[in-house]
Amino acid sequence: MPDLSWQDWPFFDPLHRELARELEAWCGPALAAIDHRDTDAACCALVRSLGQAGWLRYAVPAGPGGGWGGRLPKIDSRAVCILRETLARHDGLADFAFAMQGLGSGAISLMGSDALRQQYLPPVARGEAIAAFALSEPEAGSDVAALACEARADGDGYVLNGEKTWISNGGIADFYCVFARTGEAPGARGISVPAPGRGGAGLQAGHDDAGHLPRLGGGRRA
């Protein structure tokens, strides 16, 4: 049995302790039902299961009137730690699936327009949309100041031009938070984050020549 004495630490409140107990009881039977022979399919199944059980509501904020789908007014780091530690102990991919829902939609949670928040965050919380965080590039890696991907304003949207790589959930995500250069400011300034959906014209998701690095590229209106 895991040591759960940490639940008595003073910086956890009754909500966190109840969360830990309920999640522990859920993990065993729910995660045992996931077939891991196909990693992408397993990840999709885990997102659905986590969403249906309500755990993904801790990955996004509630928003005004609860309209963004979250369980709490703000994302609670203590709740996230409890969820990730418990999920990882039972199934590492379950922890990954939860974490990527939060990371992939994080830019929208923190700085997105009301329209983007209302469009994307509720389905993320329900496990009906898979999110991806598209920052790294073949030449720049994760050096934001050296990003080459560009987003050019076009009417009421943007045209994206560039390539991303090492994208977790690449190929299975329903939308991508793509870090792209929209201004002439040097370095990390002038960076914006359009959020194109899967299947749009010009958006290509696949793997590298070795078959194992998810990539995202092409020109895409977002």
Language-model segment annotations:
Residues 1-19, 151:
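Intrinsic disorder at enzyme termini
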Residues 53-118, 122-128, 169-175:
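Internal helix-loop-helix
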Residues 97, 139-142, 166-169, 182-185, ...:
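Short Gly/Pro-enriched turn/cap motifs at secondary-structure boundaries
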